[in-house]
Regions:
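Bacterial Sec-dependent N-terminal signal peptides
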Residues: 1-24
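Short S/T/G/P-rich N-terminal loop/turn motif that feeds into the first structured element of a domain
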Residues: 19-250
């Protein structure tokens, strides 16, 4: 019964954090790693493919260089933000498929070919802002603990609101992919020096205590330590030459 109740709370929580007037909240994302010695060929083929089949006003694709983490040296691709229905309605042309198979796929290592879907949680995010450089923090949580983790996220956001923090962040939930028990913090940064503001997820307990009090801060940190199994962080940098123009502000 307890598990049923927790599952119900989790589903309701996702509905609440995902609901907004604009239903374009879904990102499709993937990694693309060049085969040894084939980086130039991959990037040339991808640039040509995006220009031909993902231009402004068409199905958008954005690519980023991965600068840190286990996938450093790869490209990180995104399509979106979309409504779920857009994936049902999309029909790829045969020319699109053939061009990709001929000029992109032969130069890409397929060992890391998972495709994930992320959903933006606006009610858990704080002052989202566009950038061309991002710091991602992946929180891998215990299965079935989403409701508790959402409670932590709500408290953390409240602390930032009360302190009028200058560090903005977006929250995404992985709803399908390699690890569906993943929540992603997305920090926009202007330069590497700004990493200092996005590397204190729970280490910023002092600022939380000043706004929420010692007791509530301790409770939230205990939730975090209980439900988060591990983390991974990566820095990504926008590649306009490999991306659909005019969609970065989304």
């Amino acid at each position: 019964m307890k598990k049923v109740i927790l599952a119900f709370i989790y589903i309701v929580s996702l509905c609440l954090v995902g609901a907004q007037d604009n239903d374009q909240t879904v990102l499709r994302t993937w990694y693309m790693t060049p085969k040894d010695g084939k980086q130039k060929q991959l990037e040339k083929g991808l640039a040509d493919h995006v220009a031909k089949f993902h231009g402004q006003g068409s199905w958008p694709e954005l690519h980023f260089d991965v600068l840190s983490g286990p996938n450093a040296g790869s490209l990180r691709g995104f399509s979106g933000p979309h409504a779920w229905k857009a994936f049902d309605d999309r029909v790829r042309s045969q020319a699109d498929i053939d061009h990709y198979n001929k000029y992109v796929l032969p130069y890409s290592d397929n060992k890391n070919n998972s495709i994930d879907f992320w959903v933006f949680a606006p009610k858990l995010s704080y002052n989202p802002a566009p950038s061309t450089l991002y710091h991602f923090s992946y929180n891998y949580i215990v299965p079935g603990s989403d409701a508790e983790y959402v409670e932590f996220l709500e408290g953390f956001k409240k602390s930032k609101e009360l302190s009028k923090s200058l560090v903005s962040h977006k929250i995404y939930k992985t709803v399908s992919g390699k690890n569906p028990d993943t929540w992603v913090w997305v920090y926009p940064i202007s330069n590497m020096e700004e990493l200092s503001g996005s590397t204190q997820l729970v280490g910023g307990g002092g600022s939380m205590a000043s706004t929420l009090g010692e007791k509530e801060t301790k409770r939230l940190n205990q939730i975090y330590q209980k439900v988060v199994k591990s983390r991974m962080r990566e820095i990504i940098k926008f590649r306009p030459d490999l991306s659909t123009p005019g969609v970065m502000n989304n």
